[in-house]
Amino acid sequence: MGWRKHTSRIVYENDWMTVREDEVTNPGGGQNRYGHVQFKNIAVAVLPIDDEGRTRLVGQSRYTLDQYSWELPMGGAPLKEDPLEAAKRELREETGLTASHWRELMRLHPSNSITDEIGIVYVATGLSEGETDLGETEDIEVLTLPLSEAIEMAKDGRITDALSAATLVRVALAQSEEETDQAGNAPVDP
């Protein structure tokens, strides 16, 4: 038996999200009140990689955490906007970069027990430099560093943003598998 929703009401709403409270029957048969957030945007993040194997991180103060955060360039795509176009916009606005090649790397749910938010991550290559176009709420520092160093930042906890950390760890795993395959030591399926 899965979850069964009996009633749902809006507790709070703004331009970016709706907070709902539902009366539900849980999988064990108990009655509960379940609060959750429905986002009106899709999160898009970009892993830019230049011809020298470097990437860009953006650093900014995150109000909800009251701390500084290093993360991939990212933002929100309204549900009716093409996520790739939003990713291109965010990369240009936050770093000044444009890219000639784009590839979707993955989709994930950053916090699936409390929200329906979807995150889409793209890899951007064929980079060209330009000017940033920051919004009034953005006070961003751009850091250019080797991709391997960004991966280390995710591994050692200096990057805590879920989309950024998941992306960098996934890239590290793919690189490790590729190195294993090239060395002829790939695991054999049982």
Go through each PLM region and give its residues.
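Acidic pyrophosphate-coordinating catalytic loop
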Residues: I10-N14, Y63, L108-I120, S176
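Long hydrophobic alpha-helical segments typical of transmembrane helices together
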Residues: I151-P190
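Conserved Nudix-box catalytic region and its N-terminal flanking loop in Nudix hydrolases
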Residues: G2, V37-K40, V44-R89, P190
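Active-site/binding-pocket entry motifs
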Residues: T25, Y63, S128-E129
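Acidic, metal-coordinating catalytic segment for phosphate/diphosphate chemistry
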Residues: R9-A45, D50-D51
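A short, amphipathic edge element
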Residues: M1-R9
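Unchanged
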Residues: R33, I42-A45, D50, G75-L163
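Hydrophobic residues on conserved beta-strands that form the core of alpha/beta folds
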Residues: K5, V19, R33-Y34, V58, ...
